[in-house]
Amino acid sequence: MSSTRHTPDIDAHTISISTAVENVQKGDQLKIEVLDGKTIVAVKNVNPAAAEVITLKNEKLWSPSSPFLYNLKITLLRNGKTVDAITSYFAMRKISMGPDAAGIQRMLLNNKFVFQYGPLDQGWWPDGLYTAPTEEAMVYDIDQLKKMGFNMIRKHIKVEPARYYNYCDINGMLVWQDMPSGDLGNKWETRPGVLDRATEKERSTESEGYYRKEWNAIMNTLYNFPSIVVWVPFNEAWGQFKTVEITEWTMKKDPSRLINSASGGNFFTTGHMIDLHNYPHPAMPRPDVFGSKLLLVLGEFGGLGLPIIGHTWQEKDNWGYQSFKNADDLFDKYATYTKRLEEFIRLGLSAAVYTHTTDVEGEINGFMTYDRKVIKVAVDKLKTVNDRLYLVPAP
């Protein structure tokens, strides 16, 4: 067995499981076992050539507050004997959209509105750039963000190792996954780009081919991680091309997730959401223009900067979108931003992304310093104001 593919359907109370089996022989069977911990809750013997749909009774749903994972064991039987066996896991969770009582589209988790809020996370490290020094260091960031009261991470222009997403699955952290950009050059005609005022990059045949190949590979490789709920094909017009075609292909390839076709501008009428970037203060797309058809999200804002002497990448020329001299002033400003987000949620905002988890080289606008030695604002203070966002009801 070389791979599996798991697709939950909480409305039908089923999990669809397909298994790629090489060198199948006549009479081979797959024994699929679904376990709650070590207790078998469903078992089925099936033909290796077909996907199998298994019904679960009284299934437990996965969410940030209750990240329950079912264990999965698949055994290849030949003449009644085991010739191969693998273990994996899956979650029963659904990400979708639907109108609230006011007709505004809301992002739904397991058919209920859950405001999604988290940092822009580039996953940079001073000693390894895109490579964390250890697994413990990598998951440290996720742990701290959870303690700060965030329920989502936008993984920005980077794909992490599988262990990263596995940890998000286990700990109940939602993930928006970006496609790493290439071919800089095209711009939107107005900032932040709006519908019907967009430009696209004319990429070479080779460049376009690499994009399609790599985006396909990313989606295939990460498909089984339930924490991933949004795919982001393009960001701020960077290398953006054939937006409608790429977005609709992405939606067709994975209808189980939402698609943020163009985060931050260069919008086309495709995908599930319209995504505004605004610095430093929060803003939102107009609900009266877009809200009845698209999810309204704030894909980037904030960037409040605080340099910590002895923990900056460079001594001079550090920057934030707005800089402060002490943590108290920074937090006070941040708290005003979360209060504004509460107002936006009532108007129809479904998600927001703050810039960002850590300082990144010359950018000193992280919650933590680049070396992770200093958390700039007390975790409990951040959690207090962040938690309020999840209590704001939709109409």
How should each PLM-predicted stretch be described?
Residues 1-167, 171-175, 214, 229-230, ...:
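Secreted/periplasmic carbohydrate-active enzymes, especially glycoside hydrolases
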Residues 142-144, 152-380, 385:
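Substrate-binding/catalytic cleft of secreted carbohydrate-active enzymes
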